[in-house]
UniProtKB/Swiss-Prot annotation:
Keywords: 4Fe-4S, Iron, Iron-sulfur, Isoprene biosynthesis, Metal-binding, Oxidoreductase. Its EC number is 1.17.7.3. It comes from Bacillus subtilis (strain 168). The gene is ispG. HAMAP family: IspG (MF_00159). GO terms for molecular function: 4 iron, 4 sulfur cluster binding; 4-hydroxy-3-methylbut-2-en-1-yl diphosphate synthase activity (ferredoxin); 4-hydroxy-3-methylbut-2-enyl-diphosphate synthase activity (flavodoxin); iron ion binding. Belongs to the IspG family. Binds 1 [4Fe-4S] cluster. It is an enzyme of class 1 (oxidoreductase). It comes from the Bacteria. Disulfide bonds: none annotated. This is 4-hydroxy-3-methylbut-2-en-1-yl diphosphate synthase (flavodoxin). Converts 2C-methyl-D-erythritol 2,4-cyclodiphosphate (ME-2,4cPP) into 1-hydroxy-2-methyl-2-(E)-butenyl 4-diphosphate. It catalyses: (2E)-4-hydroxy-3-methylbut-2-enyl diphosphate + oxidized [flavodoxin] + H2O + 2 H(+) = 2-C-methyl-D-erythritol 2,4-cyclic diphosphate + reduced [flavodoxin]. Pathway: Isoprenoid biosynthesis; isopentenyl diphosphate biosynthesis via DXP pathway; isopentenyl diphosphate from 1-deoxy-D-xylulose 5-phosphate: step 5/6.
Amino acid sequence: MQVSEITHRTKTRPVKVGPLTIGGNNEVVIQSMTTTKTHDVEATVAEINRLAEAGCQIVRVACPDERAANAIADIKKRISIPLVVDIHFDYKLALKAIEGGADKIRINPGNIGRREKVEAVVKAAKDKGIPIRIGVNAGSLEKRILEKYGYPTADGMVESALHHIKILEDLDFHDIIVSMKASDVNLAIEAYEKAAKAFDYPLHLGITESGTLFAGTVKSAAGLGAILSKGIGNTMRISLSADPVEEVKVARELLKSFGLASNAATLISCPTCGRIEIDLISIANEVEEYISKIKAPIKVAVLGCAVNGPGEAREADIGIAGARGEGLLFRKGKIVRKVPEETMVEELKKEIDILAEEHYAKLEAEKAKLKEETQKA
């Protein structure tokens, strides 16, 4: 499908990945990738479970050989989030991964050989109802495209994507997700913009080979932030040379910055100044760690000045502003009570828990109401 303007994420074609629907709504799904050898089932499952606990919603594993492919079924049985299997050239590995219960495969159909091999993979994916992700990478574009454009360009990347899409569409396969990764931020932004104009399949966002924890976080936030701000993107991975749990943490913070994470708590904290009379930095870090696993849209403020604090964080749901020997606990900018400095963090945590429980109870009530209405209908 050729469109003339950017396809906003809410207008992309919905594609199912396990129990999740990718595209067709405002939720951008967080993805990461394991660093373990996939054939080591114990290590891989342990890492996936750590990622899921941190907020990862889809996980990808490498499948370079038959040992890895044979492990997919065992891994799948022991994890709680959808599993994507990364295949490069061997279609037989794709077939084995699909048979093992993969929720999605990442494969470029133009790279796996003769048409009958592609047909076999497409038929297996169709039979199981799983999508295929086409992964275009500026560093591995086809020779003919590099010869045409001279070097990796956004137009060349889109042409590569359309080539692989057409192979699948010609086989009447449309459960497709596409990524347009580059390590150059400007190239990635341009490629995703052009892709969003060229087709309406969901886009998986990423800046590849972005670097170490600090540099990669900055680079990914710069590139993916620009793309997200244009309404582009349905799934996202922050690629870091670090523990993959850090990728998930950065992704959550980035989505929260754009108001795209409906199930995450957010921290507001001031940059500190000479007026501060509490150890604000350590308090902010402690609170940030505490709220990292709370799946509720709560804004929490930690501020060092009792004079300006409540006013500066009027939009926060709950917060503390420290002063000498005490803190002010406030909700929605209004002071609730004074608390001693030594207990103010614990008091704040209690209030956070109350708000989280209220949110969870509201969700359960909404679910019950919806179930009742469905039964009546």
